[in-house]
Amino acid sequence: MMRILKTLFLAFIAAISCYTTPSFAETAPVSARKDNRIRFVNYDPYNVTKIIGSIRSSVQLEFADDEEVTYVGIGNSVAWQVAPAGHFVFLKPREVQPVTNLQIVTSRQDGTKRSYQFELQVREGDVSAGNDTYFLVKFRYPEDEALRKKLAEAAKAAQREENFVNDIFNTHEDFGPRNWAYEAQGSPLIEPASVYDNGKTTTFTFLGNTEIPAIYLVSLDGQEALVPKTIKGNKVIVHATAAQFTLRRGNDVLCIFNKRFVPAGVNPETGTTSPSVQRKVNIGNGYE
């Protein structure tokens, strides 16, 4: 019975020791496939990266392109020479001495900072491939890569949506119903070859290499204002309809009047603001 209790007690002590004793381990960079002197490590601000330097050789640390080294602290400046340069740091061991540490702080373009912790070891011997030699240690940033991928996918999705909308717009612009009831008064030098609208946008077509004049929308109170527009070849698509537009180029002025203007932007054929919605009039109930 005493032997069993003693065994259980020793097992309990061993378990408590394993549970309460902290473990410390530095992160060793992973070797590149082609040459083990080139190494990679994922960034973690709470990991210590192990660096092994060889006498008569140097080690290059490479951080993200948007980082710049702003502070370097080293435990043993006698055994190691440190030279920061942009988002790089160059290390050169001078003599074999006990393990020391290196701390680096970088600033990013967005104003945030990153902190790096290193354990530095020095060894003598051959620096050829196959030995425990470090020439370049490049940091990787999985979270940044994931964010960049997410933003790129979002940008592609937005572009696809924009292309889809533009395709619909172009189809409606090219083949949809049009209002051609426009008149012009003023200088013939800046007169467009044609003007029409589809109930939402107004298209001005100019001949050949004609210098396109400025196009102003004239409000109901007579005020002129520039409006958003899209230029496609010799066409200027104004993103609005109006009772009157004024074209100006130098001293030349031309007024364009829409004889069928409807302030609500009614489609000239369907009677609504959408080519897919047909307006119907119900007689006898007081509504239409």
UniProtKB/Swiss-Prot annotation:
It comes from the Bacteria. Pfam families: CagX (PF03524). Its main location: periplasm. PROSITE patterns: PROKAR_LIPOPROTEIN (PS51257). Keywords: Periplasm, Signal, Transport, Virulence. Residues 267-288 are annotated as: Disordered. Induction: During the interaction with the intracellular environment of host cells. One of its GO terms (cellular component) is periplasmic space. Residues 1-25 form the signal peptide. It is found in: Periplasm. Residues 269-279 have a biased composition (Polar residues). InterPro entries: Conjugal_tfr_TrbG/VirB9/CagX, VirB9, VirB9/CagX/TrbG_C, VirB9/CagX/TrbG_C_sf. NCBIfam families: VirB9 (TIGR02781). The type IV secretion system VirB/VirD4 is a major virulence determinant for subversion of human endothelial cell (HEC) function. VirB-dependent changes of HEC include massive cytoskeletal rearrangements, a pro-inflammatory activation by nuclear factor NF-kappa-B, inhibition of early and late events of apoptosis, leading to an increased cell survival, and, at high infection doses, a cytostatic or cytotoxic effect, which interferes with a potent VirB-independent mitogenic activity. These changes of HEC require the T4S coupling protein VirD4 and at least one of the effector proteins BepA-G. Belongs to the TrbG/VirB9 family. This is Type IV secretion system protein virB9. It comes from Bartonella henselae (strain ATCC 49882 / DSM 28221 / CCUG 30454 / Houston 1).
